[in-house]
Amino acid sequence: MNRKDFVVLPWGKPGNSVKLKYRNAQELRMEKVQLEFENQEMEKKLQEFRSTRNKEKEDRESSEYYWKSGKVGKLVNQSYMMSQNKGNVVKFSAGKVKLKLLKEQIQEPVKPTVNYKMANSSECEKPKINGKVCGQCENKAALLVCLECGEDYCSGCFAKVHQKGALKLHRTTLLQAKSQILFNVLDVAHQFIKDVNPDEPKEENNSTKETSKIQHKPKSVLLQRSSSEVEITTMKRAQRTKPRKSLLCEGSFDEEASAQSFQEVLSQWRTGNHDDNKKQNLHAAVKDSLEECEVQTNLKIWREPLNIELKEDILSYMEKLWLKKHRRTPQEQLFKMLPDTFPHPHETTGDAQCSQNENDEDSDGEETKVQHTALLLPVETLNIERPEPSLKIVELDDTYEEEFEEAENIVPYKVKLADADSQRSCAFHDCQKNSFPYENGIHQHHVFDKGKRDFLNLCLRNSSTYYKDNSKAETSNTDFDNIVDPDVYSSDIEKIEESTSFERNLKEKNIGLESNQKSDDSCVSLESKDTLLGRDLEKAPIEEKLSQDIKESLELSNLYKRPSFEESKTTKSSLLLQEIACRSKPITKQYQGLERFFIFDTNERLNLLPSHRLECNNSSTRITLAGQKSQRPSTANFPLSNSVKESSSCLSSSHPRSRSAAAQSSSRAASEISEIEYIDITDQNELSLDDTTDQHTLDNLEKELQVLRSLADTSEKLYSLTSEEFPDFSSQSLNISQISTDFLKTSHVRGPCGVEELSCSGRDTKIQSLLSLSESSTDEEEEDFLNKQHVITLPWSKST
């Protein structure tokens, strides 16, 4: 590598590394070629320039346009010269020839001396400036005066030169304003002299005129003059005046004496005592004028004491202060505090103004007095008779809260309302995030019957006896996860009377009517999209559980009443209800999923019958409160067993039923639809069946619906309650033919408070009907029942 190909770029700071920059060989070659090309162009231009110069020189030499000795010709007419010189051409020898050009001497015009002198004088003299000249540049007029230094400057010099460094804090004022102040004072003094001495000799008047002329000259001219000029003017004036003023002409001048005399003159003139010592006043005035001129030459600023002068038509300053101080004092004190004398020029006007202000103060004093008296008046006490409050707050004991401290957010319990004629059960399901607290929903007083205003205390307590029976009967560990909705305990219930004797009579009557009661074939509610109602499976003998189930179904029942205020008005005077409210603690069990759904043995079916029997005996009208639940119940996704399905189909053709047969049939169809919906989701592979069996099962279902419709009309006469109390059941009995589609729609219709109303009620069935299910059930019936269930899904799926 060649060092010429690198360029060293040293850095200024030591310690930095030297950077080398490599130059490309091609770039160097290109630069070399470009430089050579530029050199060639420059050489060509030089050659052309030389050639043109030589040509011009040759042309100039070849032409005969040159001066020759002894010949005079016109310079302008070149053709004329050429024509005359053709014959007289002189041939020169080869070599260098020297030529000398002769020029005519032209006489220049002589400039006048006056103009020359004026030009010189204009150059030497400075331009005239009106006023005082700037002390720095001496070319511009002074506009500002430095208060600290006392010198005059133009605006440019003061900003650029003077106001720098240590002098930047110096202040300035306008030069014109100060001069006006000084001249105003002098004018007043001379006017005073003229007024005092109108009959003095003319010489003295001439002297005053001269002094006044000097005063009226601009300040700049006066300031430019030196002290010698002032002395000359005073000497001339002193010669014209009387010999008594010779001391001033000699040069003896006392500044302090002149200042004191001037102050005395001013004080006497202001007070009006200017008739005494006229000569002294004149002498002091003359001294003052001379002193003023001397002060101007020495750049001293005239200062006089501050004097506040007020016009005669207004109050004096002290009077205003006095009024401001005593404006709130009473009128009696004002007369005592009035001063005896005021200044003479303001005496009359001051009295008038004082009278006006006193009147104003009198009005202010009256206002203040009225206000004070109003404030000091005794306050009248108004004795307002208040009636006794109609509302009283009664504090309850803490025992109610202590009972439910152990309860969690979700606590299942049932509320049973019993009647002698009919038995219906209601189960309620509430969400965790209910707007009412649990304790407030249970322990709250309600006022019913506007005439009597009876308080109803709905306190749900645990009964040990019922809990034992319930634990034995419901060994299937069913967890309904229900909470009582506080809206149910609204104005629907009018009176509740508790009596143990009524309960005993009710139990005996229900046991006597045990043989005539018919069991409801289904207890399945249409649920919301989020939750599905299921049942736990149990493996207990049928014989041990039948008697307990019958007793439990008779004891735990209530009269279904819809929570609406309109229905409470219709049943207010006729019904007398009693509430037997019992709450059962939650019984949880591990989730089993679809573990037993696909087991269809006869033994398994026999073991699974008690769960269906329990559900039939504990059949109730269920109102599910679909709220914002965070957890689903443990039995939400449990499917129904085959025994339950077969029992629901076999019990469809039962004995004549009560008035609620229409609702029972509708609930049966709804339960079958919900079961088939779940089966259709979980087991879609078993939907391929014969068309003949499908048509057969459809015909059977239509016949059953017609029979139930006829039974619904006859059962209305046997039932004691009117159709007004159960608007849902009467409306459902009219639409049993369309039950497969209507129940699917009504399942998603929610009433107020987000409640889904689900129908399901009935009575206990005979023991023989339940036993016959286990004996007559075979594998063939199981297959037939499965076929029926799958066929039922077909029209429902088509309709959707």
From Swiss-Prot:
Q: Which residues form a coiled coil?
A: 21-64, 693-720
Q: Where is the composition biased (Basic and acidic residues)?
A: 197-213
**Low complexity compositional bias, start-end:** 641-668
Q: Which residue stretches belong to region Disordered? A: 197-220, 341-366, 626-668
Listed A to Z, the keywords are: Coiled coil, Metal-binding, Zinc, Zinc-finger
Q: Which molecular function GO terms apply here?
A: zinc ion binding
Query: Which CDD domains has this protein been placed in?
Result: Bbox1_ZBBX
Q: Where are the zinc fingers (B box-type)?
A: 129-175
Superkingdom of the organism of origin: Eukaryota
Keyword presence, Translocase: no
* Segments of skewed composition (Polar residues): 626-640
Name of the protein in question: Zinc finger B-box domain-containing protein 1
Q: Which organism is it from?
A: Homo sapiens
What's the source species' lineage?
Answer: Eukaryota, Metazoa, Chordata, Craniata, Vertebrata
